[in-house]
């Protein structure tokens, strides 16, 4: 298959490196790795690059220094890489220079995929940080918000206090929000953090 029909997308986040292989414009396969272990990502992605040819590599990274360590062993990879940034894209107007590439990618995707039949689109991205990004159907950036993600909120409560336990998002699977009030510490933290996030999203 021609190189132009293949593209490898790499999203380097604060916690995870998420990758997707697009064939003919459709997502074909996905992989993810720990950002703390870029060597593993480099080894696997190099094998994918060799297997699937020299197609475009699109990269969004919010962690400076990780991308060079991933592609340092890729032969001729640099000339195929498109690094997403506010200045490298042409779809969205009004983006500010320091805007994270993850939010730039969200804005571009929202505009391309979700504004054909709508006046505007909002992307809410729950990661290490929770971000909100909005664009209209003319490709104008409408603004957004950034706050602490749920995992980091749990960690902040634990490490900033003497007695509150550290919880994880995995423990939220069976959380009931039938009432905002809780009668034990763990449930009080869970409901407080989750309802706080829900409230933020609804307010925005």
Each language-model region and where it sits:
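Gly/Thr-rich phosphate-binding beta-strand-loop-beta motif of the actin/hexokinase/Hsp70
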Residues: 2-28, 110, 118-141, 157
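Short, structured loop/turn "capping" segments at alpha-beta junctions
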Residues: 117-124, 142, 163-173
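Short beta-strand-loop/turn "lid" adjacent to the catalytic site in phosphate-handling enzymes
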Residues: 49-101, 137-150, 183-194, 198
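Active-site rim beta-loop-alpha module in soluble metabolic enzymes
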Residues: 147-204
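N-terminal glycine/serine-rich phosphate-binding loop of ATP-dependent small-molecule kinases
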Residues: 1-89
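Short, charged, surface-exposed secondary-structure boundary motifs
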Residues: 40-44, 90-95, 153-158
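Conserved phosphate-binding catalytic cores of ATP/NTP-utilizing and phosphoryl-transfer enzymes
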Residues: 1-3, 89-121
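Acidic-glycine-rich active-site phosphate/pyrophosphate-binding loop
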Residues: 79-89, 128, 166-177
